[in-house]
Structures are given as structure tokens and as C-alpha cells.
Amino acid sequence: MSYNSNPYNGGQYPPYNTYTRPNYSPNNGSQSNNTVHQYQPPRMPPPSTRPQTDGNSNQIPMENVGHISLSSANSHAYAPPSGPPPNTGANSYGNPNYSGPQLPNTQTQSYNLAGGGNFQYQYSTCQGKRKALLIGINYLNTQNELQGCINDVMSMSQLLIQRYGYKQEDMVIMTDTASNQRAIPTRQNMLDAMRWLVSDAQPNDALFFHYSGHGGQTKDLDGDEVDGYDETIYPLDHQYAGQIIDDEMHEIMVKPLPAGCRLTALFDSCHSGGALDLPFTYSTKGVLKEPNMLKESGMDVLHAGLSYASGDIMGAINNVKNIFTSATNGFNNNALQYSRQVKFSPADVISLSGCKDNQTSADTSVNGFATGALSYAFREVVTQNPQLSYLQLLRGIRQVLSNKYSQLPQLSCSHPLDMNLAMVL
């Protein structure tokens, strides 16, 4: 049964033209309609007074939200990383075929966690069924309107269909201009669609999740965050229904997956470094990154000063809070070990995010086409270089962005990842 025909909440929904959207105040008296516009960039981040839920329908304060808008960006030519790719093999990999970077060993892998504990996981061949959930929210006619998020998911759907063998009937696209009420990205619809994505998942399936929209942070309540903050994403009705926190997304989309099932996630939003709560993050050198709280605190001091100097008082306050959190946590490596114990998955889950947890992500325009910076860079790299390793993918994305943006895209995984493996979707 498809997502759009699945009566999650029972009953029939009214036709789209009788559906009343959340009561947002339009800018300058403008009226909403159901067509895709050339959108104007937001003038300010979402207000810090909007409600946030903790996953149990309890509202909690939210903090550190934002999404930077840039009016224009020049198209950057992608140059491959220096040095040759890893030795290639003769194996075929289904759809598409790879003859470059090495293919994964699909036998059960083991990982011994420092401090005790043995965990097992399995790479996916990605030769089973394919499903995709793509969510793009422009927050039409609000103070925080974005330009490129709807374009991002439409472009991503074409990339997945044309290059990676996904089918339209196995894909759900949610935007604020959708004609189907089930495809409006409200909080409940988004959670239902996430459950649809992972329903009946089997080993070697290939699932894809893409979110382009506002992101933020809020206080961590369960002790699994090194920096003391959960990452969040903003549904269209977040003012009334609340945000969606990383713990919820992990519980819904990662935890139910069997060993050997692939979920690839791409978060083009602010503060998205840990948006899926995956415990292993890798550098462009291909090595596992450990948190350096002293360095992070130093950067927060710098960011606090720059925010204050530029008039961003809330940004300065939030960076000072980050400094205090790092100090009071005693540079908390215990949180990292706890996270790896409780967030480890036998499935094959990989997440690309637009920036680090403490950074904002750009909403921009390339040659007059509104887009998110990460979504654009991802499309550029995989289109021009179809046979990539994960290391080459991460380096390529950073290279595309490096001359224009300060944000540092992140690659995280639910288990230790060989970064020289072929990138497959």
C-alpha cells in the first residue's frame, strides 16, 4: 500500500482546495497560492519561542535555531580529490554498476567498543527494493520563507530516478505546495511518512531520506549528546505541533531496520551534523573523528564575539551557552561512549548533513536557480563523478562549498565505516 493511500488516521481527507493551512501571517499582505514561486530569502531565523516536543507530546523550550540565506552564488566546478581512487575490483553491483572504489564485504562485521561491548553490523548490497522520502519546506508567506527547498527535492527525485533506479511509485515527495493533503509536510504527516519509509524493510534494501528546510537545536534530555543539545527539524506546522528532534527520527527510521538494510539520509538544514543521531562521524581524511571540546569551545568564543559584533545577540548568547555546556560536561567523552552504545545499529545507515551541529546551512541561488547549498553540492559531485567512494564524496562536497561557504558538511554512520567503499544508493 502506498503512503498517500494509507489511511493512517482513518477517514477521508477533504480536497486540497478546501484544506486550511496553518494560520501564518503573510509578508507584506501577499497571498499564498499553489504554484512554485521565485522565493525571497528569509530575513531572520525562526523565533526562539516556538514550541518543541520531547517525543512524548510534552512541550519544551527550543533554542539555537536558524537558517542563513545568501542572495547568490557562483557555480563551482567540481575537481576530484587528489590521488587515485582505491584499487578496483571486477564485481558488478546491480543498478548502478561500479568499477571504481571497492565494494563492501556483506559478511557480518564486528566492532569492539572501548570500555566493553561487542557489536555486529552488516553492509547492504542495495540490490533489494528502493524507497525514498523527500521533504522540502519553503515556509511560504512567512517571515522565515526559504527559496530553494522545494527545488531541492524535485531535483533529487529526478536524480534518484534517472541515475539510481528508484521508481516514482516508491517515492513520497512532501512540499508546502503539494495538492495531496497527505503530502503537506505537517509534523504528523512527516512522522507517518518516516514510518512508511522503513516499513517492511529487508536486508539489502536501499532507502533514501532527504530533508531541506529549517533546522535548530534544543536541550538534550537523555544524555546522548556530547554538546548537550539535540538537533531538530521544522515541520510546516511547527508553531503549533512542535519540532521533530533527532531522537525521534532515530527511533522511527534507524532502530527498526534489520542488519544489512541501507538508509541514506541527507539533511540540508542548520545544526544538522547529528540530525539522525548516528554515533560515528568521519573527517575528510577518512578517519573517525573524536570530539575535541577544547577546540569547539574556542570556536564558540570566536563565534560569540562575531555574533555580538554583527548585532546577532541571540547567536552570541547561544555560543556562550555552548562554552558553558562544554565546561560543565567536563569535555564529556562519557556521552560519546553512551551514544555509541545506545545508537549503534546493525543496519547500514549513512547520513550526510549540511553543516556541523553548531553551524548554519546556506539557502542560496546558483545561476538563478534557488537551492540549498548541500543539495546542490551533492548533485554536482555524484553527477560529474558517478563512481565515488564515500571519502571522495565527502571531499568533493566540501570542495564545491569551500570557496563560498563556511559550513562544513558531515558524514556520519550507524557503525564504523570503511570510507574507501563505493558510494551506493
Swiss-Prot record:
GO terms for biological process: protein quality control for misfolded or incompletely synthesized proteins; proteolysis. Keywords: Apoptosis, Cytoplasm, Hydrolase, Nucleus, Protease, Thiol protease, Zymogen. It is found in: Cytoplasm; Nucleus. Its EC number is 3.4.22.-. GO terms for cellular component: cytoplasm; cytosol; nucleus. Residues 13-28 have a biased composition (Low complexity). GO terms for molecular function: cysteine-type endopeptidase activity. Residues 1-110 are annotated as: Disordered. The active site is at residues 214, 270. It is an enzyme of class 3 (hydrolase). Residues 29-38, 88-110 have a biased composition (Polar residues). Gene3D superfamilies: 3.40.50.12660. Induction: Induced by stress-inducing agents such as H(2)O(2), sodium nitroprusside and cadmium chloride. Involved in cell death (apoptosis). Belongs to the peptidase C14B family. This is Metacaspase-1.
